[in-house]
From Swiss-Prot:
Gene designation per UniProt: cyoE2
EC numbers on record: 2.5.1.141
Pathway assigned to this chain's UniProt record: Porphyrin-containing compound metabolism; heme O biosynthesis; heme O from protoheme: step 1/1
Domain of life according to the entry: Bacteria
Example of a GO biological process term: heme O biosynthetic process
Misc note: Carbon 2 of the heme B porphyrin ring is defined according to the Fischer nomenclature.
Enzyme class, UniProt record, top EC level: transferase
Keywords: Cell inner membrane, Cell membrane, Heme biosynthesis, Membrane, Transferase, Transmembrane, Transmembrane helix
Name the UniProt record assigns to this protein: Protoheme IX farnesyltransferase 2
Compartments in which it is found: Cell inner membrane
PANTHER family linked to this entry: PROTOHEME IX FARNESYLTRANSFERASE, MITOCHONDRIAL (PTHR43448:SF2)
Amino acid sequence: MSLKHFIQITKPGIIFGNVLSVAGGFFLASKGHVDLAVFLAAMIGTSLVVASGCVFNNCIDRDIDLKMERTKNRVLVQGLISLKLALVYATVLGVAGVALLYKVANPLAALFAVIGFIIYVGFYSLYLKRKSVHGTLVGSLSGAMPPVIGYVAVTNSFDMAALTLLVMFSLWQMPHSYAIAIFRFNDYLAASIPVLPVKRGIQVAKKHILIYILAFLVATLMLTFSGYAGMSYLAVAAAMGMYWLYMAWTGYKAVDDTVWARKLFVFSIFTITALSVMMSLDFKVPTELLLTYAP
C-alpha cells in the first residue's frame, strides 16, 4: 500500500477530463468576471466528488474487474488496499467535495454534485451497469454534471445554458462509451456486462452512435443560437461535430471495427476538450451587461 495506489483508485484520467468540463461551464457563466475562490471550489470540489465516485466504483466492480484484461490488475482487485479502507477513503473524498461546493460556491452546485454521485454510484455502478442495456444512458447523466456544476457555481440558477450543457455532455457520453465497448468488446463479454454492442450487436451500436452524434451536434450549436456562446465557438463546434459524424458514418464500411472504434473514441476526447476550451474563451456577454459597463 502506497500513495500511488490511493491516487490510482481515484482514476486521475477521468478526474482530469471532468475538470476541463467544469472549467468550461464556469467560464461560460462567468463571462470574463472570475471569482477565484468560487472557481477553485468548483474545480477542487467537483474533483473530490468525482474521485469519490471512482473509488466507490472500484470497490463495487472488484468482481467484474477481475474478469477483464484491462482491469484485472487494479489496486483493489490485487488487494493492495483493503475494501474497508477504500470505502472510508471514498466517503471522506465525497463529503469534503460536497462541503467545499456548498460552503464556497453555493448549495445548488453541491446539489448537482450529489445528484451526479447518486446516479453514478447508486443507480449505474450498483445495478444498471450489470443488469440493463440502458445503463450507459442513465450513467451518462452523471458524466454530464461537472460542466453544470461549474456553470451553476457562478449563476446559482439552472437556466437554458445549464440545460444545454446537461444535454450536450449526456449525448456525448453515449457514442464515447459505445466506442469503448466496441474496441473492448471481449472484456465486456467476459464480464457479462450488457452494453449495447455486446447485447444487441456492433451493427446496432453503430446506428445508435450515428444518431447520438447527430443529436450532440445539434445540441452543441444551441449554446450560440440561444445567445450564450459566440461565433468562434459555433465554428469549432460545427466542424468538430460534423467530422465526428463523418467518422461514425465510415463505421458502416470499416474493415476492422476495433480500429475504427478506437479512432472514434480518441476523436470524441478531442471534440469535448475543444468545446470546453471554446466555451471558456468565446462566451457571449449579454447586451444589457455591455450597456452597464459602457463608458
